Amino acid sequence: RYWPVIPVVDPNGFYTVESKIYQLTEGGRYKSQKDVMAHQLAFIVEPIKDWKINVELNYRSNYNFDHTDYQTVYGYDVSKNPYIIANQTSSVTEYAYKSNFFNPNIFTEYGKSLESGHNFKVMLGFQSELFKQRDITASQDGIMSEVATLNTTQTNAQNRGGYSEWATAGFFGRVNYDYK
């Protein structure tokens, strides 16, 4: 309710329009499900002495599903006749989103220290990122049953969606030398 001075019900026993109770209880629903899955794998291999291979793999996926339905909300006048106070037309909207992110980081290094005091180290590596996403939205007006789904609506169908992706890749290297 807005303020404590606004009455909850009118003299006929209906909720008052000003209390917004009808809009809250009968105006529709919003439901959202979000799932995030992340995996990481990292290991170091030393196939021969002083040569190390580092591997790091990262993967993340996001899934999002939203459901929104707007129901026509009625208030009642002093003669107990209904009139629309919110959502002239009932409607349902469904939204789905998915994204995937993959990031490998692989590098190898070899180091050798000689008894004469010379130290050598070589590193080579690769790093990349790949991100893909897609979404789709569908909506329709005129809910015909108690079950608010796209299949139970009748007019003004709309849909939209899209895909996008980007990627990067890079190679790197380094040579180090020092003496004693």
PLM regions and their residue ranges:
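Transmembrane beta-barrel domains of outer membrane proteins
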Residues: 42-44, 56, 109-111, 174-178
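Surface-exposed loop/interface segments of Gram-negative outer-membrane beta-barrel transport/assembly proteins
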Residues: 1-36, 54-56, 60-170
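Outer-membrane beta-barrel channels and translocator barrels
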Residues: 46-48, 113-117, 180
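An active-site-proximal structural segment forming one wall of the substrate-binding cleft
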Residues: 51
